[in-house]
Amino acid sequence: MDLIHRISRQFEDSARIKLEALEALAAPIAGAVEIMIGSLLNNGKILACGNGGSAADAQHFAAELVNRFEMERPPLAAIALTTDTSTLTSIANDYDFTQVFSKQVRALGHPGDVLLAISTSGNSPNVIEAIAAAREREMRVIALTGNDGGQIGALLDDGDVHLCVPAQRTARIQEVHLLTLHCLCDGIDCLLLGVEDQ
């Protein structure tokens, strides 16, 4: 096995998928930034959820908003619903794992808030339940998926934003999700701070 060749293919494949995603996602990402800014400027917050690598992405995004991304600015309200082990295990034990995010959305979400729902397959049952709870709370939904968008893609309304990565491999989808989250953070900072192109 030629590891150098295999590694090179990974980089090339990742770059190709990112360029393909640029065509599909640039405008929807800009729309998602505007929705998030609208919520944050009206004392709203962003609740983020996902499983596995997507849980890490939810935490990464919330940390960038609460702390900072690349520029100094005031903290922004964002909560990753993946971090409170007592709450997560209590809900999973007493009810069902499909409810671990939706119960938190019902407790913490308010009209005008935004749910950032991350699922590479678009079929994660607990993320789907979180979207249903967000509907009840009159929240907008920004969904990051891959493949064909799965069940989540079919659930979204006109007021929501679907950021579906045009790829099948989970690793490639996750790589584009991370870049997308960084684009969201950068867009939020630029609109909040009035930063011109650099």
Swiss-Prot record:
Listed InterPro entries: GmhA/DiaA, Phosphoheptose_Isoase, SIS_dom, SIS_dom_sf, SIS_GmhA/DiaA_subfam
One Pfam family per UniProt: SIS_2
Involved pathway(s): Carbohydrate biosynthesis; D-glycero-D-manno-heptose 7-phosphate biosynthesis; D-glycero-alpha-D-manno-heptose 7-phosphate and D-glycero-beta-D-manno-heptose 7-phosphate from sedoheptulose 7-phosphate: step 1/1
Enzyme Commission number(s): 5.3.1.28
Entry binding sites for Zn(2+): 60, 64, 174, 182
Residue ranges constituting the SIS domain according to the UniProt record: 36-198
Residues spanning the membrane: none
CDD domains named in the record: SIS_GmhA (cd05006)
Keyword Transcription applies: no
Cofactor notes: Binds 1 zinc ion per subunit.
GO molecular function, one term: D-sedoheptulose 7-phosphate isomerase activity
Gene3D superfamilies: Glucose-6-phosphate isomerase like protein, domain 1
SUPFAM superfamilies referenced in this protein's UniProt entry, alphabetically: SIS domain
Compartment list: Cytoplasm
Gene Ontology CC, one term: cytoplasm
Keyword check for Cytoplasm: yes
Cofactor(s) needed by this chain: Zn(2+)
Keywords assigned: Carbohydrate metabolism, Cytoplasm, Isomerase, Metal-binding, Zinc
Protein residues bound to substrate: 51-53, 64, 93-94, 119-121, 124, 174
Origin: domain of life: Bacteria
Biological function: Catalyzes the isomerization of sedoheptulose 7-phosphate in D-glycero-D-manno-heptose 7-phosphate.
Note: The reaction produces a racemic mixture of D-glycero-alpha-D-manno-heptose 7-phosphate and D-glycero-beta-D-manno-heptose 7-phosphate.
Similarity remark: Belongs to the SIS family. GmhA subfamily.
Subunit composition and interactions: Homotetramer.
The name this protein goes by in its record: Phosphoheptose isomerase
